[in-house]
From Swiss-Prot:
Upper classification of the organism: Eukaryota, Viridiplantae, Streptophyta, Embryophyta, Tracheophyta
Species of origin: Arabidopsis thaliana
GO CC annotations on file: mitochondrion
Sorted UniProt keywords: Mitochondrion
Name of the protein described by the UniProt record: Uncharacterized mitochondrial protein AtMg00320
Miscellaneous comment text of the record: A stretch of 270 kb of the mitochondrial genome is duplicated within the centromere of chromosome 2 resulting in the duplication of the gene. The expression of the duplicated gene (At2g07737) is not demonstrated.
Length: 127
């Protein structure tokens, strides 16, 4: 109906737009072309079948084995690693090592404390 009005030179009315696509224009984006690592997305009208699909029943599998987002994060980490000075990297590594060793010692102490308490209570009473 809108195409017919455009062909005849008429302006589409609100009634004809509502009749064609409902009260609201529902849009979604889709991949139109892939150029290297870049995916060009473009808006299009959402189909009723796509809107009625429950998304929880059909999980979307990962797009590829090498996810673009993870690849970019790894690249940024490599660049940041070399951009910092050497003493900053060594300080960060030292802090991480101390933090992890302190956490493991804290768990060992708690476990040893429980074992000593159980052993002390069992041997302190006369038979």
């Amino acid at each position: 109906m809108i195409l017919l009005q455009a062909y005849e030179g008429l302006v589409p009315t609100l009634h004809s737009i509502i009749e064609l696509c409902g009260k609201y224009r529902l849009r979604r984006s889709r991949d139109s072309s892939v150029c290297g690592w870049c995916i060009i997305r473009k808006d299009c009208f959402a189909r009723r079948a796509w809107l009625n699909q429950p998304k929880s029943r059909k999980p979307k599998p990962p797009s590829s084995s090498l996810d673009l987002h993870n690849f970019c994060q790894a690249t940024h980490e490599i660049f940041l690693l070399f951009s910092q000075e050497l003493h900053q990297n060594s300080v960060i590594a030292l802090v991480n090592f101390l933090h992890s060793s302190f956490e493991s010692r804290k768990h060992d102490i708690a476990y040893t404390g429980k074992a000593i308490a159980i052993d002390f209570s069992s041997t302190s009473f006369p038979p």
